[in-house]
C-alpha cells in the first residue's frame, strides 16, 4: 500500500497557474471520509487557523442536497426518501461551486439541516485556498465533477463498521430512532452503495483501507499536500507517462464513455 501510494502521489502535481489543488474523497456512508479529511487538516496544522488564512479547506457533498418538495420532505421525515441516490444531490450546483473554486473565487456553501431535511437560509463562505478536499458518498459519480479533481481518494471500510457508525451518528446527531435507521439502511443505503458508490472506487488514485486509522496512507497524502503548499512540486506534467504511471487527466480521457454502473 505504502509503496504504491507514494508512487501514485508523485504523479499528481500542482496545476499550472497556481490554481487550487482539488482532492475528491469518496467512500460509503460512515466510512470515515470526514475523519480522513479532518486528520489531514490536523496533521497540516490547519485545524486552528483563521478561516481567512486557511490553505486547506474541506467541503462536504452533504451540503448540496436538493431542496425537497413538500411530498419528498414528508417521506424524508418517515425515513422513506432515498438520500443516497445521485438525484438527491444538486449536481449542477456542486459543479458550479467547484469550478468557481478552481478559478480562485470566494464561494457560498449551502447549509443542510438533517433534522428538518431542509436547506437553511444562511450559507458558509469559503475563501480561496491552496488545497480543497471535497468529500461525499458520490463524489466520483458525476464525470464532470470527477474530472475537476487532481487527486481522488476512496476510503474503504467494511460494511459492519460503517453500519454501526451510522447508527450511532444518526441517533446522536440527527434524532433518528434505531428502527428507522435500519429500515432506511436496508431499503436505500446498502443498495445505493452497491449500485452507485462502490463502482466509482475504480476511479480512485489512492484507496485508504480502515479510514483515519490508516496513518501510513494519510501521512503520504499529507506529505504530498505539504509539498504543494511549500511550492516544492514542479508544474503538472501533461505529456504522457511519468514514473511508469499515467497522469490522472490522461486516464480520465479513457473513462469518458464509461458509467459507474
UniProtKB/Swiss-Prot annotation:
ATP binds at residues 27-35, 213. The gene is Uck2. Homotetramer. Phosphorylates uridine and cytidine to uridine monophosphate and cytidine monophosphate. Does not phosphorylate deoxyribonucleosides or purine ribonucleosides. Can use ATP or GTP as a phosphate donor. Keywords: Acetylation, ATP-binding, Kinase, Nucleotide-binding, Phosphoprotein, Transferase. GO terms for molecular function: ATP binding; cytidine kinase activity; identical protein binding; uridine kinase activity. Its EC number is 2.7.1.48. Residues 1-24, 240-261 are annotated as: Disordered. GO terms for biological process: cellular response to oxygen levels; CTP salvage; feeding behavior; protein deubiquitination; response to axon injury; UMP salvage. It is an enzyme of class 2 (transferase). The keyword Acetylation applies. This is Uridine-cytidine kinase 2. NCBIfam families: PRK05480.1, udk. The modification N-acetylalanine is found at residue 2. The modification Phosphoserine is found at residue 254. Belongs to the uridine kinase family.
Amino acid at each position: 500500500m505504502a509503496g504504491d501510494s507514494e508512487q501514485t502521489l508523485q504523479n499528481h502535481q500542482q496545476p499550472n497557474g497556481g490554481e487550487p489543488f482539488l482532492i475528491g474523497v469518496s467512500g460509503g456512508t460512515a466510512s470515515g471520509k470526514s475523519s480522513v479529511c479532518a486528520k489531514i487538516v490536523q496533521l497540516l496544522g490547519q485545524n486552528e487557523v483563521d478561516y481567512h488564512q486557511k490553505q486547506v479547506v474541506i467541503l462536504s457533498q452533504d451540503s448540496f442536497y436538493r431542496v425537497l418538495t413538500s411530498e419528498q420532505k414528508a417521506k424524508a421525515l418517515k425515513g422513506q426518501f432515498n438520500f443516497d441516490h445521485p438525484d438527491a444531490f444538486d449536481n449542477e450546483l456542486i459543479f458550479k461551486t467547484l469550478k468557481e473554486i478552481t478559478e480562485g473565487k470566494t464561494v457560498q456553501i449551502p447549509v443542510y439541516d438533517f433534522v428538518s431535511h431542509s436547506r437553511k437560509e444562511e450559507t458558509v463562505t469559503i475563501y480561496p485556498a491552496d488545497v480543497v478536499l471535497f468529500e461525499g458518498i458520490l463524489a466520483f459519480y458525476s464525470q464532470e465533477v470527477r474530472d475537476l479533481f487532481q487527486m481522488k481518494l476512496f476510503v474503504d471500510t467494511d460494511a459492519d463498521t460503517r453500519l454501526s457508525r451510522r447508527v450511532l451518528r444518526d441517533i446522536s446527531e440527527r434524532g433518528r430512532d434505531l428502527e428507522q435507521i435500519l429500515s432506511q439502511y436496508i431499503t436505500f443505503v446498502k443498495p445505493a452503495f452497491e449500485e452507485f458508490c462502490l463502482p466509482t472506487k475504480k476511479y480512485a488514485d489512492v484507496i485508504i483501507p480502515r479510514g483515519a486509522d490508516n496513518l501510513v496512507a494519510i501521512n503520504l497524502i499529507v506529505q504530498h499536500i505539504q509539498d504543494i503548499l511549500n511550492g516544492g512540486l514542479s508544474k503538472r506534467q501533461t505529456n504522457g507517462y511519468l514514473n511508469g504511471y499515467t497522469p490522472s487527466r490522461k486516464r480520465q480521457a479513457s473513462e469518458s464513455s464509461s458509467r459507474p454502473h
